[in-house]
Amino acid sequence: MSFNPDYESVAKAFIQHYYSKFDVGDGMSRAQGLSDLYDPENSYMTFEGQQAKGRDGILQKFTTLGFTKIQRAITVIDSQPLYDGSIQVMVLGQLKTDEDPINPFSQVFILRPNNQGSYFIGNEIFRLDLHNN
């Protein structure tokens, strides 16, 4: 395989789609909306230090998140093509859930090509950017 020359447009379209499905009111709707983006066995996620593997493990994590209202502002989306046709995506932004204060966040994705000519999330890391004072 080779580098995907359309990596930036793919990354931006993916992020718009992902957050439109993630930023819904309940965990079950969130999991249902995102299920097609994960591979049954070959997807990995670290969410605030907690790891999950495979579609079912990741979607289970999404159903247990305690918030119902999400407001998100994306500051920047950076992306790079990887040698095997994958795309690395990094998102920086701000996030407000329920009545919690606004917090900065970072999220990284590795989008892997699948056999249908599109992508699945191979790897994902999410962190609120909280610093000890």
Swiss-Prot record:
<dbReference type="Pfam" id="PF02136">
    <property type="entry name" value="NTF2"/>
</dbReference>
<dbReference type="GO" id="GO:0044613">
    <property type="term" value="C:nuclear pore central transport channel"/>
</dbReference>
<keyword id="KW-0813">Transport</keyword>
<protein>
    <recommendedName>
        <fullName>Probable nuclear transport factor 2</fullName>
    </recommendedName>
</protein>
<dbReference type="GO" id="GO:0061608">
    <property type="term" value="F:nuclear import signal receptor activity"/>
</dbReference>
<dbReference type="InterPro" id="IPR045875">
    <property type="entry name" value="NTF2"/>
</dbReference>
<keyword id="KW-0653">Protein transport</keyword>
<dbReference type="GO" id="GO:0005737">
    <property type="term" value="C:cytoplasm"/>
</dbReference>
<feature type="domain" description="NTF2">
    <location>
        <begin position="10"/>
        <end position="128"/>
    </location>
</feature>
<dbReference type="GO" id="GO:0006606">
    <property type="term" value="P:protein import into nucleus"/>
</dbReference>
<dbReference type="InterPro" id="IPR018222">
    <property type="entry name" value="Nuclear_transport_factor_2_euk"/>
</dbReference>
<comment type="function">
    <text>Facilitates protein transport into the nucleus. Could be part of a multicomponent system of cytosolic factors that assemble at the pore complex during nuclear import.</text>
</comment>
<dbReference type="InterPro" id="IPR032710">
    <property type="entry name" value="NTF2-like_dom_sf"/>
</dbReference>
<dbReference type="InterPro" id="IPR002075">
    <property type="entry name" value="NTF2_dom"/>
</dbReference>
<keyword id="KW-0963">Cytoplasm</keyword>
